[in-house]
């Protein structure tokens, strides 16, 4: 299971580590940069040249640290600072000074030549205004480069909360985000600009937030196994529940098949499909393990067996592919009435 945070939740988690736990911001920045470099080397092992474009905030500080580590590993690196000098965070100013001392050039205009990798560290998750003017020109120029494009934490121009594009955005091939995925990286259109998303640990965690009802999360395949009922050696298929699937009008056998198959896959012991007679043959071929009961849509009283089926079932799944016809409306009303 992966937790998905908005900007305020991520800032609170970051602040918790710095203010309450006592891990310096520069330490977290170094960890973030190292994770970025590892992913760049993994995705682009033959990269020899890189351009890192940095802003004034801590996202820019991450970028300067990335530039330094790449330089130390033998990559030819150039760095462009496109932020405002007076707006630099303390950490970003520190990282710039270190980079200058080891001889990595820092320019203020984007070079015209091409690079194997272009790294975006202009704006972080705190961006909440529309990108315009010079910054818009910078983002546009970054997108014009032909090299592999990497975003540090989040692609500049994406709202971390909503995925909205704030005027324009860096279109990344890879985004290396830290600690938690950000909501805007999963919502469209932000997801389109995020590229391949990888979440890397840097020592930030917030157990209180993870237990909160305010945090979003999404399941991974391994998480679903925890919801599967375990099979006891002395059990049989009747032990694990009886599911009645009322699905599939004429020509909609696929809906009934998928719903019934899902019931089996998630652990149901007995599954019975109640569907239109026209779907009988194909469903018997696709899912022979299911018990099949059908109704004749043209019959005067098509649902004579329905009550006994409802009495049999522990769970009723109804609706998939039944359409909006009069016969479907009658079926829904009948099920509803008999289960009041």
Report residues per predicted region.
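Small-residue (G/A/S/T)-rich helix-start motifs and N-terminal tracts that mark the onset
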Residues: 1-78, 185-340
């Amino acid at each position: 299971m992966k937790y998905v945070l908005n900007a305020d939740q991520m800032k609170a988690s970051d602040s918790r580590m710095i203010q309450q736990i006592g891990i310096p911001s520069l330490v977290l920045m170094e960890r973030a940069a190292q994770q970025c470099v590892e992913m760049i080397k993994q995705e682009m092992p033959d990269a020899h040249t890189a351009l890192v474009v940095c802003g004034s905030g801590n996202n820019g500080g991450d970028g300067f640290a990335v530039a330094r580590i790449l330089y130390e590993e033998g990559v030819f690196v150039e760095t462009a600072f496109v932020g405002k000098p007076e707006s630099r965070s303390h950490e970003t100013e520190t990282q710039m000074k270190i980079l200058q001392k080891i001889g990595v050039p820092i320019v203020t205009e984007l070079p015209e030549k091409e690079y194997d990798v272009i790294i975006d560290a202009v704006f972080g998750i705190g961006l909440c205004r529309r990108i315009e003017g010079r910054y818009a020109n910078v983002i546009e120029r970054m997108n014009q480069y032909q090299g592999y494009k990497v975003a540090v934490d989040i692609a500049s121009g994406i709202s971390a909360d909503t995925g909205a594009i704030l005027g324009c955005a860096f279109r990344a091939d890879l985004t290396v985000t830290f600690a938690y995925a950000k909501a805007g990286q999963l919502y469209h259109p932000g997801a389109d600009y995020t590229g391949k998303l990888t979440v890397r640990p840097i020592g930030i965690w917030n157990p209180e937030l993870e237990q909160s009802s305010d945090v979003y999360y999404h399941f991974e395949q391994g998480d679903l196994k925890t919801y599967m009922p375990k099979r006891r050696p002395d059990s049989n298929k009747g032990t694990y529940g009886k599911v009645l699937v009322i699905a599939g009008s004429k020509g909609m056998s696929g809906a009934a098949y998928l719903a019934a198959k899902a019931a089996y896959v998630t652990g149901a012991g007995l599954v019975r499909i109640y569907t239109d007679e026209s779907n009988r043959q194909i469903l018997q071929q696709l899912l022979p393990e299911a018990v099949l009961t059908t109704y004749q849509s043209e019959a005067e009283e098509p649902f004579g067996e329905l009550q006994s089926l409802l009495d049999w079932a522990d769970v009723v799944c109804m609706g998939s592919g039944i359409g909006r016809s009069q016969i479907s409306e009658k079926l829904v009303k009948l099920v509803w009435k008999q289960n009041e």
